[in-house]
Amino acid sequence: VTAETDVLVVGGGPVGLLLGALLARAGVDVQVWERRSSVPRGSRAIGIHPPSLDAFAAIGADAPVLAEATRVREGVARSRGRTLGTLSFARASATHPYVVTLDQHRTEAILRERLEAAAPDALRPGVALTGLLRRGSTVEATGTGPGGEPVSVRAAFVVGADGARSTVRDLLGIRTTGRDYPDLYVMGDFADPEPGGLTGTALVDVGPAGVVESFPLPGGRRRYVALSGPDRSLGAPAWRPEEAPDQEAARALAAAVRDRTGADADPETCTMLSGFQVRRREAERMGVGRVVLIGDAAHEISPIGGQGMNLGWLDAAELAPLLAGAVRRGEAGPWPGFARRRTTAARRAARQAEANMALGRPLGSLAHRGREAFLRTALALPTSDLLARVYAMRWS
């Protein structure tokens, strides 16, 4: 027997969980299919920007996130041991004058709890989508359950929040365009070696050997992200949340951090390590009829700048009331205004991420001095408040 629901969300990661909770709070009957049976582990994406915290407030997730997260109130740019300038988030948002960091598995756990509170049976772990059939005013989705059994549901709308390798997008036949970048980065979480006064400060060192960014984390930890450089000397350690980090790779990252910034990160304290290459992808359409794509399924951008997950949350926050209204009124999509606004936001975020990458690439001596002068000027101008709003995603 095929079950029925108002909205099927495919993908129970951070974006799908928020959308499911928003819909449930609006009185919409929702199912969230997540192919993974187990709860994901690891810190992964850590940055949560002010507009996302505002969206979390609608489901009561802001308070528990803030109770666990670390508030980042400023960013400091450095080079060759000297401070180039400071970017304060004090006026970046009226509600949350900071960016916060929290391990992704904890953010997901909080969102999962809020979905469970609003719709106890909505999340279906271990269910993988295999087919979509659009029939007039409904979409029939088929899949396999945790034991391989067939599963099906008939929904008024289906939302693909299933990531960069979206099954929903593939089933719709929607192609992506984009490019791969040569930049290779390695990130790792260590016991924070920075002075105690920097526990609320993000640090960006744009020295001649390549950028090192770092962000404070709860529990006295700090995330370091380093450009591997033209020789890719830091390698590309694989993401293995179930295993201890590779010690040789952890030592290589710690050595790069020490050489470029002077901070003495202890490789023995490394709890997460992963390499990643940057790519940008955009779906040619954000959906077909009653099927909509959001998050990485619709637009994948560079992780540098920490905007990708937040973009998906803001997609969800804008889509939820559209879906709730359409369900109540018996209307159908698509919503070209939604697609246009979210595509514009994704392109802006992608350009910003590309600018961030460009500022962190190795340069010759003369060009590097020019970059330092540019950053000193940009961070000293009265317009630095506008720059802070840009980095805090107030435009999104």
What residues fall within each predicted segment?
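A conserved short coil-to-beta-strand element within the FAD-binding core of flavoproteins
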Residues: 125-139
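Conserved FAD/dinucleotide-binding core of flavoprotein oxidoreductases
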Residues: 85-99, 103-106, 148-149, 197-200, ...
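C-terminal helical "tail/cap" subdomain of flavin- and related membrane-associated enzymes
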Residues: 321-396
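Active-site-adjacent segment of FAD-dependent monooxygenases/related oxidoreductases
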Residues: 44, 48-114
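Short hydrophobic core segments
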Residues: 10, 153-163
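Core beta-strand elements of the Rossmann-like FAD/NAD(P) dinucleotide-binding domain
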Residues: 3-5, 148-157
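Glycine-rich FAD pyrophosphate-binding loop
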Residues: 24-44
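Conserved mid-domain beta->alpha element of the FAD-binding
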Residues: 12-21, 25, 33, 111, ...
